[in-house]
Amino acid sequence: MAKFIMVAGTASNSGKTVMVSGICRMLANKGYKVAPFKSENMSLNSRVSVEDGEIAVAQYTQSVAAKVEPSTHFNPVLLKPKGNFTSQVIIHGKPYKNLDYNEYRNEKDYCIEKIKESLDYLNKNYDYVIMEGAGSCCEINLLEDDIANLRVAEMANADVLLVSDIDRGGVFASLYGTVELLPENWRKLIKGFIINKFRGNADVLTDGFKKITELTNIDVAGLIPYDES
């Protein structure tokens, strides 16, 4: 039985992909068998898995960090944009259909079924599964059809770390707003906040850490410095 952990974000480009890679390498270095996972990824760039199927470059790179062979189970649904609001849908590494947004919505249950198959496989074959969310985990206009964030974390009974980019400003509002807008059953999955891309003296954040914990009952689990490289 695997332990599932999801890194979700308050926005795109908050640092989820790199953070998942880092956690994968840390656990792999401790001797655990670790799998990265992103249920649904939209990307034109793909790599070949050990099963001779396509997965997103991000999950391929994360598998290198985890020191495991890349598998289609790491990215069961890959969307490759084709223009005119249409994407080629890749399921478990193989082309499935070309679908526009509304057509894809009608395939949601099938995609969830395939995501569950991958979660079951990973649960049986790995010690840890480090999941990556997509974009913001709380786009309230899209929650009903979101199969990349907390719906999948709930399916996997995953603990969720919510990461936000302080370099953009408004980090505490982003964390608080995200938590408050989530449905209660998903909100309780969040076990800690991670503040990413911080520059300067961390002492200036002390009051903010205290207040966000008072408001949400969720601790700040990590502060990641900005990497100039």
UniProtKB/Swiss-Prot annotation:
GO process terms (BP):
cobalamin biosynthetic process
Keywords, sorted A to Z: Cobalamin biosynthesis, Glutamine amidotransferase
The keyword Protein biosynthesis appears for this protein: no
GO molecular function: any one? catalytic activity
- Pathway assigned in UniProt: Cofactor biosynthesis; adenosylcobalamin biosynthesis
Q: Which SUPFAM superfamilies does the annotation name?
A: P-loop containing nucleoside triphosphate hydrolases
Taxonomy, superkingdom: Archaea
Which NCBIfam families does the annotation name? cobQ (TIGR00313), PRK00784.1 (NF001989)
Task of the protein: Catalyzes amidations at positions B, D, E, and G on adenosylcobyrinic A,C-diamide. NH(2) groups are provided by glutamine, and one molecule of ATP is hydrogenolyzed for each amidation.
Tell me what this protein is called. Probable cobyric acid synthase
Annotated gene: cobQ
